[in-house]
């Protein structure tokens, strides 16, 4: 859950609430408050409420839930003569911009809070800047009215934020902390995206801004650019920023856009979500009237179409409202979860195992029948045990648990190493999740369920493990697996194979490499197998 820090005195002054009232009302909004210092709160915000990652959003929500202000606020919006020209940028094709006048960035808390909001949006909807990146500039330092978004050569120079010398884009990507962290996201064919005015580069998204347009406590007007790989996310991010600043007294200035599917930015999109009041009452187990429901929705800072059928008018900042289920949840929050009463269940039903659980249960039964004993090991392990790329913990409590396992084999070897005194042969198996690199995911990693099998004995041969594995799969699938030659540093050369079912590779097995065994302190030979159970289920 994202967490933000806010000045307690400013928050209390803007909402008219004391500390206990803030705690109580924010809890009703699924947020938890804890003091950081005498002057600061830490607020843990529910992950879907991106609008509440800012001071303006928190204030707007609290004014609604307390009934001090109802419905969507009317923010001042005016058209400007600024123009954003969007050229073709293959790696990051979407861009929008807006102007905010009459901003308040002094005292320093307001500036700090704006930067915090920017980074929270980067980490959430922006997927660590891969999907969306935000640039915030002092408008008075921008040259001209034409803003361009276009590719630039890596040899193009500018002075990056908080630097004193001019650097090429290439040097920025290679030498600055931001460049090293985000530089590889959008570079293509020796080009990088850039936001530019008449004088030169304003920012190199998603990496860094120019020092020339750096915002300070004296900044009165802002130019905001949002770029990304998904237009919907770019548009929502811009709307969130504009409305949060408007809540604090800013005036939204719309920028003309050329080269995008919209001609003005911010879009400030409104959508309509119809809902049935009878259905909401049934879902929640309450009985609110039509007028009560309308009032509750307006407490959540939204408006309602009051024709024959009701529909919520979703404002630009409520990007979490997608269907009538979300509407029902908002009605429940405004109504108050503390007002719900407990009722005994009126019907009795019997649960059943999912298809996946049935398969794993049968697999366990077959493996136990084959003479193997199930073990359970922790998902966290020691990074020195792992082979290949793995997810490491940034601040581990213990070096023994500083990495997320990328295979079940390493924990099996640790288990065997700790049980070399046991009666031979030792036959074990484990079913559990692992985490591996997956570039197709936004997070770059994905979970998968694996089965590991291991046999330790004074003497072993490949067939000692291949035979029971073959029988288990034959009984489980009704189809005999086949085996294909496979080489890996994990196994001895010529004594390993891939397990293939219906043409798809589902695992590997073989005699463990003696060097691998020595690294785990094992004195006896070991047979290892690991199957991808997600792949196994696909071929069933």
UniProtKB/Swiss-Prot annotation:
One of its GO terms (cellular component) is phenylalanine-tRNA ligase complex. GO terms for molecular function: ATP binding; magnesium ion binding; phenylalanine-tRNA ligase activity; RNA binding. Residues 268-342 form the B5 domain. One of its GO terms (biological process) is phenylalanyl-tRNA aminoacylation. It holds the Pfam family B5. PROSITE patterns: B5 (PS51483). InterPro entries: aa-tRNA-synth_II/BPL/LPL (IPR045864), B3/B4_tRNA-bd (IPR005146), DNA-bd_dom_put_sf (IPR009061), Phe-tRNA-ligase_IIc_bsu (IPR045060), Phe-tRNA-synth_IIc_bsu_arc_euk (IPR004531), Phe-tRNA_synthase-like_B3/B4 (IPR020825), Phe_tRNA_ligase_beta2_arc (IPR022918), PheRS_beta_core (IPR041616). Mg(2+) binds at residues 320, 326, 329-330. Its EC number is 6.1.1.20. Its main location: cytoplasm. It is found in: Cytoplasm. It comes from the Archaea. Its cofactor is Mg(2+). Keywords: Aminoacyl-tRNA synthetase, ATP-binding, Cytoplasm, Ligase, Magnesium, Metal-binding, Nucleotide-binding, Protein biosynthesis. It catalyses: tRNA(Phe) + L-phenylalanine + ATP = L-phenylalanyl-tRNA(Phe) + AMP + diphosphate + H(+). HAMAP family: Phe_tRNA_synth_beta2 (MF_00284). Tetramer of two alpha and two beta subunits. Belongs to the phenylalanyl-tRNA synthetase beta subunit family. Type 2 subfamily. NCBIfam families: pheT_arch. This is Phenylalanine--tRNA ligase beta subunit.
